A protein has these predicted regions:
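C-terminal effector modules of nucleic-acid-centric enzymes and ribosome-associated factors
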Residues: 12, 19-22, 155-158, 306-311
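Conserved Switch II/interswitch segment of TRAFAC-class P-loop GTPases
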Residues: 88-92, 96-102, 111-136, 140-162
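Alpha-helical scaffold elements adjacent to nucleotide-binding pockets in ATP/GTP-utilizing enzyme cores
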Residues: 33-37, 58-60, 105, 112, ...
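Conserved catalytic-core segments of large NTP-driven translation/proteostasis enzymes
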Residues: 170-311
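Residue-level signature of catalytic and energy-coupling elements of molecular machines
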Residues: 27, 33, 52, 95, ...
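Active-site glycine-centered loops adjacent to acidic/histidine catalytic or metal-binding residues
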Residues: 27, 151, 186
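Conserved G1/Walker A P-loop phosphate-binding module
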Residues: 1-96
């Protein structure tokens, strides 16, 4: 893939569309897929690590390179700047919780996605995966292109694997879903990863960017980064997390956050009060940026009170 020098300089630090959702039932291998692709465990919160499950949307940037074969730049990759010369794609992954009780958390992120990787374990029959059906239905309603990973094939014999594949094909046909490709995988052993990377580059390509449009940033998370017991004079403002959909956003820009503060007035009528704030910082993974174009998941440092940005 050939980039202009300007776009190449951008994608080295900022993911360019699309954002890819990681969907599927709980325990089927979504977070393991993210970890093996990026080198990072998306389950960063202590309660997630204790329960070994995704509770809040996990965000990780994925850098895909190509030199004789497809591979990724990870946390422990040596000579990262040298490997950057082989960069062909840079995108963000949204790891969504698969538990049935957390379906609304997944739905809050669906509009940020331009495509989805759906992970399905072959170790259990589909009738034990109601969350998978919900995720597939959401992806269909959002008209997302889908790459499907048939995972954990090392846990079943050939006969069972073929049976599970037939069940999957029948369910997809019943729902009217045609995935771009079905990739056989075993993420715990690293099988199928190179093929998956090739399919990501092929089916989720970089999109054309027009930064002259009006700014529209969609947020699905906010953060209070202050630790308990922090001195009031040392409190830092809140962080807004999400993705820029249109336009170009830079440090110093003023934005309007809607719906803002909402409640009911004396008449019992619902009201909302948008508030204005200024962008003080922009963070993409470990990179601090001065401006961003559409694509990728960002954290915006604002002047908003941290009390309004608590999870």
């Amino acid at each position: 893939m050939n980039f202009t020098n300007e776009i190449y300089d951008i994608i080295k630090k900022q993911p360019v569309n699309p954002n890819i959702g990681m969907l599927g039932s709980v325990g089927d291998g979504k977070s393991k897929c993210v970890q093996i692709l990026t080198g990072f465990n998306p389950c960063t919160h202590s309660d997630e690590q204790i329960r070994n499950m995704t509770i809040k949307p996990g965000y990780r940037n994925l850098m895909i390179c190509h030199k004789n074969k497809y591979y990724t730049i990870k946390k422990k990759t040596k000579n990262k700047e040298k490997e950057m010369e082989n960069l062909v794609h840079h995108l963000s992954i949204i790891d969504c919780p698969g538990h049935q009780e957390l379906i609304f958390i997944m739905l809050s992120s669906i509009l940020l996605m331009k495509g989805a990787i759906v992970v399905v374990s072959a170790a259990e029959p589909l009738n034990q995966k109601p969350q998978l059906i919900q995720h597939l239905a959401a992806a269909k309603l959002a008209n997302l292109p889908i790459i499907l990973c048939h995972n954990k094939l090392d846990l079943v014999d050939k006969k069972i694997a073929l049976k599970r594949k037939k069940e999957l094909d029948e369910k997809l046909e019943e729902m009217g879903i045609v995935p771009k490709v079905i990739v056989p995988t075993c993420f715990s052993r690293g099988y199928g990863v190179e093929n998956l990377l090739e399919q990501i580059v092929k089916h989720f390509p970089q999109t054309t960017v027009n930064d002259d449009d009006d700014i529209l940033f969609m947020s699905n998370r906010s953060f209070d980064i202050n630790k308990p017991g922090t001195n009031a004079l040392e409190l830092k403002p809140g962080i807004i997390g999400g993705s820029l959909l249109t336009g170009k956003l830079s440090i110093g820009d003023e934005i309007i956050v809607t719906p803002g503060i909402f409640g009911k007035n004396n008449k019992g009528e619902l009201y909302y009060d948008p508030f204005h704030t200024k962008i003080d910082s922009i963070q993409s993974d470990k990179y601090s940026l001065r401006s961003i174009i559409p694509g990728g998941l960002m954290g915006l440092g604002t002047s908003v009170s941290p009390a309004l940005c608590k999870n």
